[in-house]
């Protein structure tokens, strides 16, 4: 008789709330960005007419029609505001799960992770052969996810500062005024875009099993990242 082979064990990785909020946020955020580009087209600069303004390489830019949502300013604003509330709700649901389950401990970047982040950087740059030891998330992932959560909070706050500059004058002032809040809100979005591109690249290049786990919640065997 031939030697029996058993399939690798099924390992649970992502709770359904994590998967739901992840994919729902992808869809809603795409709509927010597309409608935001249409809103920006209405006045493609950061400053009052005839006054000083924040310099941006996107001054006067016209984004491709396929990348914009809403058709015109009013339509884009309707989409943007309608999608903002689900985005906030999904964010709060995700944060609530992290706190209730204790998963925040495995996700939060702390000072003790600095050395591990340096070693992971060396590994990705092929300056280190062995994969550094890690837990559920490696230190660079912790740094990225902690930063994204912080940026998400800033995106919401700057968004409200632009949405209600009179009613929330204290918040608008905190960010340097209406045009400054617009400026920070706009650039936070591009940081999200950059993070998304890098995130997708690393998923396929380093941890393809993580995509299966984010779809089904589980994976068989070990991640390529040795977690």
Q: Language-model segments: which ranges?
A:
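Membrane-embedded alpha-helical bundles that constitute the cytochrome b-like, heme-associated redox core
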Residues: 1-227
């Amino acid at each position: 008789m031939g030697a029996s082979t058993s399939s690798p064990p099924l390992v649970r990785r992502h709770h359904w709330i994590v998967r739901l909020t992840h994919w729902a946020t992808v869809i809603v955020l795409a709509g927010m960005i597309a409608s935001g580009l249409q809103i920006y087209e209405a006045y493609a600069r950061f400053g009052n007419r005839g006054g000083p303004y924040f310099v941006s390489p996107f001054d006067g830019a016209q984004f491709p029609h396929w990348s914009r949502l809403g058709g015109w300013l009013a339509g884009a604003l309707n989409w943007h505001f309608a999608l903002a509330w689900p985005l906030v709700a999904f964010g709060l649901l995700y944060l609530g799960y992290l706190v209730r389950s204790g998963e925040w401990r495995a996700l939060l970047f702390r000072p003790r992770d600095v050395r591990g982040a340096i070693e992971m950087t060396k590994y990705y740059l092929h300056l280190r052969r062995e994969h550094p030891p890690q837990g559920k998330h490696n230190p660079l992932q912790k740094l990225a996810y902690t930063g994204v959560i912080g940026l998400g909070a800033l995106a919401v706050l700057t968004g409200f500062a632009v949405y209600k500059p009179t009613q929330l004058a204290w918040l608008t002032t905190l960010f340097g005024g209406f045009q400054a809040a617009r400026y920070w809100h706009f650039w936070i979005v591009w940081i999200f875009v950059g993070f998304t591109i890098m995130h997708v690249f690393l998923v396929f290049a380093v941890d393809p099993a993580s995509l299966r786990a984010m779809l089904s919640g589980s994976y068989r065997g070990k991640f390529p990242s040795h977690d």
